Every structure is written in C-alpha cells, then in structure tokens.
Amino acid sequence: MKVTLIAILTCAAVLVLRTTAAEELEAESQLMEVGMPDTELAAVDEERLFECSVSCEIEKEGNKDCKKKKCKGGWKCKFNMCVKV
C-alpha cells in the first residue's frame, strides 16, 4: 500500500514539474515573438528626437526654457533630445 501511494505521489510531482516547465517555455517563446524589430524601434527613437528638438527650438526662440513635458510615454526632453527615462 505504501509503495503504491509513493508511486502515485511521485508521478503527480513529476507531472506538475513537467507542466510548469512547459508553461515557462511557452511564455518565453511568446515574449520573444511580441517584441518590435530593431528597425521599428530606431524609427520611433528618431521621431521622438525630431519632435523634441523642434519643440525645444521653438521654445528657445521665444526666450523660454524647453518644455520638459513635450516628450511623452516614458521619455523626457534633455539637451534638445528626447531621452528614455
């Protein structure tokens, strides 16, 4: 009776561990597929750099400081560029 119980518990533990490992692998593969290609990220960075430098230049011509709030989404304006915060 004890041997059967130990065998059942061992099989259950192995099954749980294999299922958990399979779920982790599936989650990792999905994370790798979701990301943006590097070329798209570079284009976004260039757009943010341009937007920030233009907005800073407009503010400087009016003898005002650059508005730090122009860059959004985790970016801030620094040295006439959008910098990731």
Swiss-Prot record:
Recorded family membership: Belongs to the neurotoxin 12 (Hwtx-2) family. 02 (Hwtx-2) subfamily.
Cell compartments where the protein resides: Secreted
Keywords for this protein: Disulfide bond, Neurotoxin, Postsynaptic neurotoxin, Secreted, Signal, Toxin
Molecular function GO labels: toxin activity
Function noted in UniProt: Neurotoxin active on both insects and mammals.
InterPro entries associated with the record: Hwtx-2-like (IPR012625)
Subunit structure: Monomer.
Propeptide: 23-48
Name this polypeptide is given: U4-theraphotoxin-Hhn1a
Principal location: secreted
Organism: Cyriopagopus hainanus (Chinese bird spider)
Tissue-specific expression: Expressed by the venom gland.
Paired cysteines (S-S): 52-66, 56-77, 71-82
A Gene Ontology term for the protein's cellular component: extracellular region
Transmembrane spans: none
Signal peptide stretch: 1-22
